[in-house]
């Protein structure tokens, strides 16, 4: 039983997001600076994040960033990834139901698109808030401080100027978590549990 309990706590869980195709698109009018690019209505937001253990049930607007081990989401133009040194987390807040499934989110990710990360450096922003996915490419950052998630060097205010583009979908779904992945320690514990069960069965046979 002890091995089983340890194994359960070692599960990593992946949560996926997908929006509908963008229904509102506003593209740049004059590319004066930065990586200008156009969104289209055939694009959408999609991706996932992984936590070290399944999210708890009945969370209410809880900051879960400390539990996130990796993330990767794309808005059709920009990919936001925990493996990218230019990606930043502004907010990673979710709510869950009694089964631990995400019912609402306030996830805001950023990608620095120019240096030196001071106004008016260019930044892309992806917002997954409630049932809406909003994407912003090549915006002008107007403030660079520490985010509410505790991440330094994050753009905390930005404007969409003539070089920027934006897109939005009012359909956003978060899928039921994939089957948890057993980590290294989970495999060790599982093997230990199987050895204990085998020993107990052998012991019973010897006694009988």
Please state what every model-predicted region is:
Residues 32-153, 157-159:
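Predominantly extracellular/secreted and cell-surface proteins with exposed
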Residues 184-204:
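A cross-kingdom C-terminal cell-surface attachment/processing module
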Residues 13-27, 67-78:
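Tryptophan-anchored aromatic micro-motifs
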Residues 3-13, 166-189:
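Short, threonine-centered small-residue motifs that mark membrane-proximal processing/anchoring sites
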Residues 9, 56, 192-195:
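N-terminal low-complexity, intrinsically disordered patches enriched in charged
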Residues 206-208:
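Cytoplasmic C-terminal tails of single-pass
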Residues 151-174:
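A eukaryote-biased signal for long
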